[in-house]
Amino acid sequence: MADNGTITVEELKQLLEQWNLVIGFLFLAWIMLLQFAYSNRNRFLYIIKLVFLWLLWPVTLACFVLAAVYRINWVTGGIAIAMACIVGLMWLSYFVASFRLFARTRSMWSFNPETNILLNVPLRGTIVTRPLMESELVIGAVIIRGHLRMAGHSLGRCDIKDLPKEITVATSRTLSYYKLGASQRVGTDSGFAAYNRYRIGNYKLNTDHAGSNDNIALLVQ
C-alpha cells in the first residue's frame, strides 16, 4: 500500500486475481436472476430475486445515510441527504401501494416489488392470484391436456366448461373486470378462451365464495 493510504496497481491486480472466481460466481448468479427469474418460469429463482429486490431498498437507503454522516465535503453530504430522502420516499410509496393492493386482494403477491398488477381467477371455490407485468384489454386462457394457463401462469387443472365467467385484474387504485367471451374446445381436454375487459373502478376483491353469485367484487367505501 502506498504511503498516502491508497493501493498500487500491482496490489489491485493481486486482489483481482484472488477474487476472480468469486466475482465470476456473483456475475453468474446475477445473469441467472435476470434471465430466468420470472414468476411463470422458475418460481424458486423468482422468489430469490424478490428477496434481493426487497433487501436493496434498505441497503441503498443505509448507504446514502452513511454517506451523509461520513461526508467527504458539504457538496457530497448534500447530495447524499437528497438521495436518502428520495429513496425513503420511493420506499414509502412502495409500502403504501402494496398495502392498498393487499386491502383490495388479500394476497401476499401485493408486496411484490416488481409489479403492482395482480390477476385474480376464481377456481374451485378459491381465488388464484398471480402477478402481471401490465393490464391488457383482452386476456387469453389456454387449456392444454386439462391444465389451465393464463398470461403465462399455470393455474391448475380445469375443463373448458368450468372456466369462470368473470376474472379480475387489480392494481393499488383500480379493479378491472373481465368477462368470458369466445371459447372453443379442442379435443377432449384442451381448448382456449378469451376474457374481455368490460368494467373498471375502485373496487375490492370479495374473497368469500360461499355464495353462488358471479359478482366477486364489492365497492370500496
Swiss-Prot record:
Glycans are attached at N4. GO terms for molecular function: identical protein binding; structural constituent of virion. The chain crosses the membrane at residues 19-39, 50-70, 79-99. Keywords: Glycoprotein, Host Golgi apparatus, Host membrane, Host-virus interaction, Membrane, Transmembrane, Transmembrane helix, Viral envelope protein, Viral immunoevasion, Viral matrix protein, Virion. It is found in: Virion membrane; Host Golgi apparatus membrane. It is a multi-pass membrane protein. Component of the viral envelope that plays a central role in virus morphogenesis and assembly via its interactions with other viral proteins. This is Membrane protein. It comes from Severe acute respiratory syndrome coronavirus (SARS-CoV). The gene is M.
